[in-house]
Amino acid sequence: MNASTKLLAPLVAALALAACNAGGSSIVPSAPAQSASLRLHAAAPRWMAQGLAKPACPMVTGVPTCLALIESRGGISPDVAGWAPIDFQTRYNLPSSTNGAGQIVAIVDAYDNPNVTDDLSTYRTQFGLGTANFTKYNQDGKTSNYPRGSTSWGVEIDLDVQMVSAACPLCTIYLVEANSSNNPDLEAAELTAVKLGAHIVSNSWICYSSNSCVKKADFQKPGVVYTAGSGDMGYNFNGNPESLDSVVSVGGTELRKSGSTYSESVWNGAGGGCSNNGSGAGVPKPSWQKDPDCAYRTDADIAAVADGVAEYDSYGGGGWFTVGGTSVATPLIAAVFALAGNASSQDAGKRFWSLKGRKRNHDLHYISSGNDGSCGGSYLCQAGTKQFHTYSGPGGWGTPNGIKAF
């Protein structure tokens, strides 16, 4: 961690106490600098304020950290607790049993989870997904000499490979483990993922409050779709790599089921909003974004479930437990790109911003309720405003309804 790195400062002592009582980090965010036109939120996201989860990795700004949130620990059955592959496949109308063979999805994470292969096998056996086509690499592209282990990043690693499996069981999955969570190592792993042949690279990590943490050149290779989580700290707590206009920024939703009917609302922790997140100048606005309330790159682009998902982790997680965060949604969206099979012809989030109304309304689920903070009623934090078509910052243009939007 470099000298400029700082822990997220406390909002109020009560929120810090709530996080501690939940077994989570006592580090909670301070509000970003006041916007000239919109009032930013001054509260921690609900998962933190109410002690509903704790971060798997330390919550810091300026350097990469993983986005997995631990919601429950061990001793539960995935049959009764946690969303499972059938829920994702049904809600998102995915052709998971027929599509995806030959498609390579790479996961880039830091450090090693030595149990990831066995954990993935347990997950896939539990849910009838068959044998995985899975390979683990180090950041140099070798299948040996892995980095040292980390139980924190181990939670993220298991989550990522299991979510790709959940949506695309026939996909080939490459896990590329960076030597550390330092920027140069993760960037090296990104390059290795592409050299290995992946056309889809999933990143469930973020540099909060930084638009210069990683080099855009490492996330802008022709014919490659990069997905990255928009963050778990709510409105305007975004950062690299998801705020790059060459990356698909993935927000989050809460999934509900009544009988056989699913519905979604914005997950309150989802990052999103305007990329001038209180740390200085934002990412320049790409020409394909025309929304009115942000003069910089607006995120997220798309979303998926980010709460209450079943995971199996024998390395540091004690078996089955439930997890959340945009680290759930990010590999799910990567897998949907693989199911569609068009990754090599995509242009990051531009695809979703360019959809016409009828196609958008048919091929994506409109997220019409929920927020990730307070922003004066703007679509940047509030779903369902229709101020800019069906878009909202935390929910993007919606969640998948089949693969035609991808």
Report each predicted region and the residues it spans.
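Polar, glycine-rich mid-to-C-terminal structural blocks
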Residues: 249-280
